[in-house]
Amino acid sequence: MGFLPFVFPFAELEVGQQLYWQIGNFRIHGQVFMTSWLLIGALLALVVIGTKKMERDPRGVQNLLEFLWDYIRDLARTQIGEKVYRDWMPFIGTLFLFIFVSNWGGALVPWKLIKLPSGELGAPTADINTTVALALLVSLSYFYAGLSNKGLRYFEYYVHPTPIMLPFKIVEDFTKPLSLSFRLFGNILADELVVAVLVFLVPLVLPVPVMFLGLFTSAIQALIFATLAAYYIGEAVEEHH
């Protein structure tokens, strides 16, 4: 291929390189921890700014926080039910905000300008370990919700409306976290890779509309994840199970 007058720099696009930290017997992904804590810190700073001086007529950041509070409250109430939705608002809100900020942080922050010994920074939700951990938290949460509200009666769900459903309900418990984690991971990673390829090919114009589309899909993915988490919890506490 030496006759080609140019070479596309696709070899510079690498997926899977990691910066590892060794903590005792555990080896963790350092770049995921760094970006996660930076984004969590930015989110906490936003909350502090918005609640530092509360006003009856909310403006600016306070207005944004109150809008988010109302939105998460309505989402939890709709999916979980009037009886226990307040207990689960902090969990659903934390999931939504962390995923939303992580997705948008990956799309808006030029992480690749920060050089690391190995690997590169990016959205925490573009790492399968993060999305699997979030999905497992959701699974543990709806098990806890069902058992805490119904006790051992919760397991009647697995044979409702007929015992034939038992193997299907067990398989469903495995497919729920799989679908949650891989949907979020796949969408965010694909968005980052598409933008990276387009930046190499047409660095000035073409990536911009794709980035805006990525922001939209990132917000949708955060909403889908939080809505499904609330739905699974609501399903576990429903009395007819």
From Swiss-Prot:
It comes from the Bacteria. InterPro entries: ATP_syn_F0_a_bact/chloroplast, ATP_synth_F0_asu, ATP_synth_F0_asu_AS, F0_ATP_A_sf. GO terms for cellular component: plasma membrane-derived thylakoid membrane; proton-transporting ATP synthase complex. The keyword Thylakoid applies. It is found in: Cellular thylakoid membrane. Keywords: ATP synthesis, CF(0), Hydrogen ion transport, Ion transport, Membrane, Thylakoid, Transmembrane, Transmembrane helix, Transport. The chain crosses the membrane at residues 30-50, 91-111, 128-148, 193-213, 214-234. Its main location: membrane. GO terms for molecular function: proton-transporting ATP synthase activity, rotational mechanism. NCBIfam families: ATP_synt_6_or_A. Key component of the proton channel; it plays a direct role in the translocation of protons across the membrane. F-type ATPases have 2 components, CF(1) - the catalytic core - and CF(0) - the membrane proton channel. CF(1) has five subunits: alpha(3), beta(3), gamma(1), delta(1), epsilon(1). CF(0) has four main subunits: a, b, b' and c. Belongs to the ATPase A chain family. This is ATP synthase subunit a.
